[in-house]
Amino acid sequence: MKIQIFLNLLYQNLNHQYIFDFHDLMSEFLYELDRKEIYEHSINQEQFNEEDFLNQRAYVLTNGNKYYHDIISLIKPLDGELKCPQLLTLPAKAWSIKNNKSIEKYPHTPKYNIQAKSNTKYW
């Protein structure tokens, strides 16, 4: 529900550059959370799965600044059962709805690579 509300706000009220800037900022936060120490400090993890780790990091972003800082500072463990894959496609969906075009035609590549282990400084 939270994602749908944000999607509506994003595509109804914002221009293309704002959507692209949001995507870049989201990618930066996901990139910063891409750390071996965060994964190793997590709970409810069976074995490393790149897609799950990405979706878990996305969940962190949906829960606000304090939660993000608690995770990145290792105050709280990342919970392997909590995921939010919908966030990852939010900018492309907003652009698609706003422009009445296919999501595959989304023209923006985010500033940071969000895939697991792309932040080589911390792996």
PLM segments and residue spans:
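Basic, alpha-helical nucleic-acid-binding regions used in initiation and control of genome expression
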Residues: 68-70, 74-123
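Long, charge-rich alpha-helical interaction segments
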Residues: 1-2
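Core of folded catalytic or high-affinity ligand/protein-binding domains
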Residues: 9-81, 88
